[in-house]
Amino acid sequence: MQTLETPQTTSKPEFDTTIHRRKTRPVKVGDITIGGGFPVVVQSMINEDTLDIEGSVSAIRRLHEMGCEIVRVTVPSMAHAKALATIKEKLAQVYQPVPLVADVHHNGLKIALEVAKHVDKVRINPGLYVFEKPSPTRSEYTQAEFEEIGEKIRQTLEPLVISLRDQGKAMRIGVNHGSLAERMLFTYGDTPEGMVESALEFIRICESLDFYNIVISLKASRVPVMLAAYRLMVKRMDELGMDYPLHLGVTEAGDGEYGRIKSTAGIGTLLAEGIGDTIRVSLTEAPEKEIPVCYSILQALGLRKTMVEYVACPSCGRTLFNLEEVLHKVREATKHLTGLDIAVMGCIVNGPGEMADADYGYVGKQAGYISLYRGREEIKKVPEDQGVEELINLIKADGRWIDP
């Protein structure tokens, strides 16, 4: 599943139709690789209590079967951390090993050290890992105070970094705009710069211990903040000679149509710029509903092709058949033929030209009849009521049909 075609180039990259992804180091998470030119990885997170062993195993399996390649679980206590050992064991017994990430937050050193034994990656939040309760009377941090807390962070982070390094496992430094540490807020403000500096502080500690299996995220609930943070992170990493892969997401995107649009606006924009190595669409819905959105974003950008690509005009007064109904029938009949491009066009105006790149075309040319195309070549004209059946026969004749 993790294979890439040879990138195409033109003499003017700014007008290229191929997305040129930023070069990043490969980071292994179980049997999945993030970055390093591998396909963009799809992630999600279960919402079961990790102490519910059976429920967690079932939830992880459901996500993985839908195409979620890395699954995150929350680990708020030592009991939850130890439960991961059983979850991992049961997954292997009743299903198969699945790359797992533990989400560790407030003052989580002991929890992180325990759970690092049982998962493939540990996610920490720099704003909460060494949690300093905000003071209502404080208005600034002196340089000495800033550095004192920085040293405390180093002492607390080092044991986890050493553990992950020695086990060959990975870490995600996951900055959230809404949970920046107070000293970062006072020093840099509630800004993308504060998010980036927060991540860099943790990266430098990791690098000082020769640990480089790092993935970075800088999430925000507002798309413009999220975009600015990732772009600034890339700029700073380029300046510092860093090549860590990036995990993209809009946190707290909500639900329904708007939640999907909001996530796509953030994630899709960065991916189109070549930024991003793994994604999670965060919806206030069942986690399983996040996975199709992820793959749709990747397919739309040409980064991963995991379904049929349908090209269809929006319909107008020239349309010679019920376009919406026919598109539905074509989709239902062919949606399992991963890798094909199929065009459904209502009239000859938008027909051959607009669908030139499609493998097959279904075009209205005169009332009661449709024309079937292979690429740019018209193959036959058939009665409208036989159109879908004849399209299937054409695909079969070309040896490109597989039974659903």
Swiss-Prot record:
Cofactor: [4Fe-4S] cluster
Recorded family membership: Belongs to the IspG family.
Coiled coil feature spans: none
GO molecular function ontology, one term from the record: 4 iron, 4 sulfur cluster binding
Gene3D superfamilies per UniProt: Dihydropteroate synthase-like, Sulfite Reductase Hemoprotein, domain 1
Broadest EC class assigned to this enzyme: oxidoreductase
Database matches in NCBIfam families: ispG_gcpE (TIGR00612), PRK00366.1 (NF001540)
UniProt keyword Ribonucleoprotein, yes or no: no
Xref: InterPro entries: Dihydropteroate_synth-like_sf (IPR011005), IspG_bac (IPR016425), IspG_bac-typ (IPR004588), NO2/SO3_Rdtase_4Fe4S_sf (IPR045854)
Pathway: Isoprenoid biosynthesis; isopentenyl diphosphate biosynthesis via DXP pathway; isopentenyl diphosphate from 1-deoxy-D-xylulose 5-phosphate: step 5/6
Entry protein name: 4-hydroxy-3-methylbut-2-en-1-yl diphosphate synthase (ferredoxin)
UniProt keyword annotations, A-Z: 4Fe-4S, Iron, Iron-sulfur, Isoprene biosynthesis, Metal-binding, Oxidoreductase
One GO biological process term: isopentenyl diphosphate biosynthetic process, methylerythritol 4-phosphate pathway
Cofactor descriptive note: Binds 1 [4Fe-4S] cluster.
One of the Pfam families matching this protein, by short name: GcpE
